[in-house]
């Protein structure tokens, strides 16, 4: 479950209703989703962050029960992932991500 593949919306909605933690599989999606010139790049530019931070911020704002566990290969990447919690996506970005065509 990530911004490019939202097939578990009904499960997430149920978890949110019941207060059950939801750990999305592969929260950053594929490389194309979070590439510097990928589909999240324009949202990242508007919010002064990276596409990966947009993907994680969307998950964190989507529901308070979402617990993304992104992988990391370096300290810089870990910081980038953690800083996603500081990104607040505007309502337009949230709506765009919620209705964007899916990409596995």
Task: List each language-model region with its residue ranges.
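Beta/alpha (TIM)-barrel catalytic core signal, keyed to glycine-rich beta->alpha loops juxtaposed to Asp/Glu
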Residues: 1-104
């Amino acid at each position: 479950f990530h911004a490019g593949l939202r097939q578990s919306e009904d499960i997430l909605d149920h978890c949110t209703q019941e207060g059950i933690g939801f750990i999305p599989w592969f929260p950053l999606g594929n490389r194309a989703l979070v590439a510097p010139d990928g589909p999240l790049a324009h949202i990242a530019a508007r919010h002064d962050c990276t596409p990966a931070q947009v993907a994680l911020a969307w998950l964190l704002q989507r529901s308070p029960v979402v617990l993304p566990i992104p992988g990391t290969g370096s300290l810089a990447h870990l910081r980038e992932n953690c800083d996603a919690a500081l990104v607040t996506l505007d309502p337009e970005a949230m709506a765009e991500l919620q209705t964007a065509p899916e990409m596995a």
